[in-house]
């Protein structure tokens, strides 16, 4: 089937979100997509993976129940991963090591993970959460109804859901400064930031 280029390049786009801070070697690894079923339509430029879908590239792992990859008439790729009812889409990826002996991981989850190549954004929606851990210890965490990460300028917008009342607010936890850290070195913020449109 001629569909290989469609899902392959869609998957590349889907997986490119982590390259700025992710393990550099991951982008050089093959992309593997596993599922219980695959349906492809070369004419409509659609590839659908269903049933315990797992996407792997190096240390990057994305898990859900359904992955829909499409290419629009202008050639832009779009990918949407959704979970089983009552579950969440999850991803994790190791970051490049900055400090010897410290292994950092990024973890995320939400009801839906979307990659939009035209806008060059990655979006986690509904019960969205992104966290960073060091050697298995949670360091920073951001939660909201929608997390939009712009791959072009490395900015994030986290939106709450006011309709949910106080529980619909955005929350961010930032780890305190490490007492072993050089006092003259600025603290690298790993949480979220709100940017003006």
Regions found by a protein language model. Name each.
Residues 1-197:
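Mature-chain termini and adjacent capping regions
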